[in-house]
Amino acid sequence: MKATTYAPFAKPLYVMVKPVGAVCNLACEYCYYLEKANLYKENPKHVMSDELLEKFIDEYINSQTMPQVLFTWHGGETLMRPLSFYKKAMELQKKYARGRTIDNCIQTNGTLLTDEWCEFFRENNWLVGVSIDGPQEFHDEYRKNKMGKPSFVKVMQGINLLKKHGVEWNAMAVVNDFNAEYPLDFYNFFKEIDCHYIQFAPIVERIVSHQDGRHLASLAEGKEGALADFSVSPEQWGNFLCTIFDEWVKEDVGKFFIQIFDSTLANWMGEQPGVCTMAKHCGHAGVMEFNGDVYSCDHFVFPEYKLGNIYSQTLVEMMHSERQHNFGTMKYQSLPTQCKECDFLFACNGECPKNRFSRTADGEPGLNYLCKGYYQYFQHVAPYMDFMKKELMNQQAPANIMKALKDGSLKIEY
């Protein structure tokens, strides 16, 4: 009889792969990763070798304690590697699978998608994440190529190819100072293009100059860096979430899946939220650069958060090191008193540590910059979440909330 698990109490080990490092055909103004190329100026080509690809795939699969293994390919722009690279990766995955089930997901800006790419993704059941920031006016505000030309038209051509070939895809949408002002235009766009799985990523960056040419601040650096102009404000973020939620809860529950709403309901239920930012602890998802360097997190690719290199340490040694364990547990331990006493701690968990550079009303450091927006959102959705939680506990569908709101059996009063 075949065992269904390799270590029943273990968690999967995740390391996201950067096969081209930070190399990209776009130059999005708010990109947090583009400047990471400055960390590797001594490398003439930021391209993962076939030798490293094989070493990583063998070790990554072998380090898993579960029967399912997920590979996540990230950039830079992942499609700047030729299709042959990913075909080779799949051959190696089969070679080293050792009976495990292998899944792949890939994040792309969508501009380089072709029929050939889409056929490959469909035939091999890859999940494709596409970066798109809403309608053309919003998307093209910051997502331009290196010549300063807008990218929306090419992205939509790519999305239409994914649809044509029946590829499973979802959207990663950055919420910034501009598109946050138009939440319903933003949300309705995704419904119009029939995108049923959407992740909102609020952009918050601070500017601190480095000698190597980088200009984005890490959490470990001074807290006084000036906020980047494109950053979404706490008030914008709260209003954005509440406005879209009000539309979604009346019309779209069970039809359109918005990650933050799903994660909020999971936390309301006492389940795992499925996204690191809203979990009590993080640190379970590392990232490996094109040369084998491993970092604590995709948003912490700074020298001070480098765990080592796969040529000198194993993935297990790095991802289960005391240093990485401390990185993950500090998400909770470093919360200020205001957070630990907050009614919505269970739902928020302080969000991502990278955004915790504000001070509380008492002057304590470590408050999330977006706290005010999140608090507004959680306070707003609480009665709806209570209803959906009750439905789930009675083995009923959360989507029943739409009927309850329409027939008046659920009345929300603030």
From Swiss-Prot:
Whether Nuclease counts among this entry's keywords is no
Which gene is transcribed and translated to give this protein? chuR
Q: Where is the Radical SAM core domain?
A: 5-250
Disulfide linkage? none
Q: Which InterPro entries match?
A: 4Fe4S-binding_SPASM_dom, Aldolase_TIM, Anaerob_Ser_sulfatase-maturase, rSAM, SPASM_anSME, Sulphatase_maturase_rSAM
Q: Name one Pfam family in it.
A: Radical_SAM
A GO MF term = 4 iron, 4 sulfur cluster binding
UniProt-reported outcome of changing residue 282 to A: Still contains 4Fe-4S but lacks activity
- What does UniProt give as the signal peptide span? none
> Which residues bind [4Fe-4S] cluster 2 per the record?
276, 282, 297, 352
Please describe, based on the UniProt annotation, the reported consequence of changing residue 28 to A. Still contains 4Fe-4S but lacks activity
* Name of this protein: Serine-type anaerobic sulfatase-maturating enzyme
The annotation note on the cofactor reads:
Binds 3 [4Fe-4S] clusters. The first cluster is coordinated with 3 cysteines and an exchangeable S-adenosyl-L-methionine.
The pathway noted for it is: Protein modification; sulfatase oxidation
Please tell me where [4Fe-4S] cluster 3 binds in this chain: 339, 342, 348, 371
